[in-house]
Amino acid sequence: DTAGGPYTTIALVITSQYLDTAVTEGATYYYVVRALDTSFNRSADSAEVAATAQLRTVTLVFNVTVPASTDATLRSVYIAGFLDRLDGNLPQWNPGGVALTRQDATHWTITFTGKETTQIEYKYTLGDWDHVEKGAACDELGNRQLTLSYGTTGTQVVNDAVLNWRNVLPCGN
């Protein structure tokens, strides 16, 4: 907690690397290492190093499967939501603001980056709120929710499915 100590033991490890995950973003921590040899003789403290905790960047990949009827609309698939919480100065809740990339008639994708623990809500559209995703029985859907998680690779993959669209058969308004 303070430069120059005193120090508190936070872990006993048998590798040459350690990741301290019990930290607070923006706080500065001071670390020293002590080693034991095979006879359990303890070394002196290493030189002190300081580190300031920062949230890690997550690569966020959305893959969405859409109904076969989507292609006949000649519209692109969009994502709308609290995208302004992600990197890149993205719009908030703009139904035609962020287009996905078409992979084939029923698969679309987009990749973002953002900081771990960021929470977002989102929906898929065909460019406007008159063509927003609907449920299996053409029912209204709540917002999808997601918390960015770094995991083991730094990439979070979200596989979603849109069952129907408003104003596209079989759904009306």
Task: Please tell me what each predicted stretch does.
Residues 1-8, 32:
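Extracellular low-complexity, O-glycosylation-prone stalks/linkers
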Residues 9-14, 99-103:
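Short beta-strand segments within Ig-like beta-sandwich modules, predominantly Fibronectin type-III
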Residues 14-19, 106-108:
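Short S/T/G- and acidic-enriched coil/turn segments that sit immediately N-terminal to beta-strands
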Residues 20-41:
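Beta-strand-rich modules
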Residues 26-28, 117-121:
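Extracellular Ig-like/FN3 beta-sandwich strand-entry sites
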Residues 36-55:
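Extracellular fibronectin type III
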Residues 68-117, 127-149:
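Aromatic-rich carbohydrate-binding modules that target alpha-glucans
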Residues 151-173:
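Compositionally biased low-complexity segments at domain edges in trafficked proteins
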